[in-house]
Amino acid sequence: SVGFKAGVKDYKLTYYTPDYETKDTDILAAFRVTPQPGVPPEEAGAAVAAESSTGTWTTVWTDGLTSLDRYKGRCYHIEPVAGEENQFIAYVAYPLDLFEEGSVTNMFTSIVGNVFGFKALRALRLEDLRIPNAYVKTFQGPPHGIQVERDKLNKYGRPLLGCTIKPKLGLSAKNYGRAVYECLRGGLDFTKDDENVNSQPFMRWRDRFLFCAEALYKAQAETGEIKGHYLNATAGTCEEMIKRAVFARELGVPIVMHDYLTGGFTANTSLAHYCRDNGLLLHIHRAMHAVIDRQKNHGMHFRVLAKALRLSGGDHIHSGTVVGKLEGEREITLGFVDLLRDDFVEKDRSRGIYFTQDWVSLPGVLPVASGGIHVWHMPALTEIFGDDSVLQFGGGTLGHPWGNAPGAVANRVALEACVQARNEGRDLASEGNQIIREASKWSPELAAACEVWKE
């Protein structure tokens, strides 16, 4: 076309391209779009593609200085959501050149930036992303990954056990260290700083790090097993965060922790790089995730946040428990658990996986099941999550009537019983309660725990 035609034109003329063949290098996104009444789905889908890539609300003459065809996002497919009125899944393809290499921050600023406040949409949710091989390869990913972690800890063939130290706020460093020691001495692999524990007036970070390290070495010497405590390095500035990680390294501990959403992806990626360079494992907590992922029609699904974390870097991440929830949620949760652990995951809509994802040998992340679980859940957890997971019992350890160490013993005995039963070919789903009962006959600690938390 000759000259430049000013004015507002429909997005769908430029950004809705149903004939587009997606490239292997494109980043693909699946959005759940709820248009305002009267807005056709094609226009809404095209608007999403435009606003999250090259588009603006009106035609600008500087468009003529670049090749939109090369840089624009394209809405290439739209399908109605079954059982929902006026909801659509819009598939958008983004050219790889729109994104800075190795930056989750930049990827999100584009894909889930301003577009979520867009007037023509009543609501918008990012359900899934396909990260192309070429982009995955620009990320370091998890500092160590599942296999290296097992080798460092010398623990194989079973899930790992953790416990969050409670009360989360108010303990002095010395008493906190004592609780850590008792749990590790009883048989847990890890204890954990609560995500809110950073460096408050009642317990400064350096004191906590010191007493936790002492507890850890004492428990290690007495049990002959390698122990860890997730020292929370999250801080108000990146510099302070790295300072804490450096001190953890100087103490010689195996693992530190970070709140990746409140801390931010830039801070998280910096910490992940430090951890790989210095041999520290990195435990990731997902505080704030529900702000983003809880609404069914707006925000982002957790599987997207999980993929982003695997790119940014973390060796463990909290990912829900599944136990006692609805069947459907179990499939969906297992979907993103596989996305965290496996090298290659096939598209499977029944599990909420919209795209086939190839991680091209990026290390895997251990999913952490945490929150409201106790010994009676152990068979189900072992069956659902398998060996490559961390099972975290906070109250389920510290709430034991005889104290922390017996609580830890109960959990370890229950876990070992479940793993042994599984290896003998028994069905944990149907025989779980019986397996726990049998084990509690020779473990008074487990028997007491079974009594407190009736099945």
Swiss-Prot record:
The keyword Oxidoreductase applies. Mg(2+) binds at residues 192, 194-195. Transmembrane segments: none annotated. One of its GO terms (molecular function) is magnesium ion binding. It comes from the Eukaryota. Keywords: Calvin cycle, Carbon dioxide fixation, Chloroplast, Disulfide bond, Lyase, Magnesium, Metal-binding, Methylation, Monooxygenase, Oxidoreductase, Photorespiration, Photosynthesis, Plastid. One of its GO terms (biological process) is reductive pentose-phosphate cycle. PROSITE patterns: RUBISCO_LARGE. The disulfide bond which can form in the large chain dimeric partners within the hexadecamer appears to be associated with oxidative stress and protein turnover. The modification N6-carboxylysine is found at residue 192. It catalyses: 2 (2R)-3-phosphoglycerate + 2 H(+) = D-ribulose 1,5-bisphosphate + CO2 + H2O; D-ribulose 1,5-bisphosphate + O2 = 2-phosphoglycolate + (2R)-3-phosphoglycerate + 2 H(+). Its cofactor is Mg(2+). The modification N6,N6,N6-trimethyllysine is found at residue 5. The record marks 325 as: Transition state stabilizer. Substrate binds at residues 114, 164, 168, 286, 318, 370. One of its GO terms (cellular component) is chloroplast. The active site is at 166 (proton acceptor), 285 (proton acceptor). It is found in: Plastid, Chloroplast. RuBisCO catalyzes two reactions: the carboxylation of D-ribulose 1,5-bisphosphate, the primary event in carbon dioxide fixation, as well as the oxidative fragmentation of the pentose substrate in the photorespiration process. Both reactions occur simultaneously and in competition at the same active site. The basic functional RuBisCO is composed of a large chain homodimer in a 'head-to-tail' conformation. In form I RuBisCO this homodimer is arranged in a barrel-like tetramer with the small subunits forming a tetrameric 'cap' on each end of the 'barrel'. Heterohexadecamer of 8 large chains and 8 small chains; disulfide-linked. The disulfide link is formed within the large subunit homodimers. PANTHER family: RIBULOSE BISPHOSPHATE CARBOXYLASE, RIBULOSE BISPHOSPHATE CARBOXYLASE LARGE CHAIN. Belongs to the RuBisCO large chain family. Type I subfamily. This is Ribulose bisphosphate carboxylase large chain.
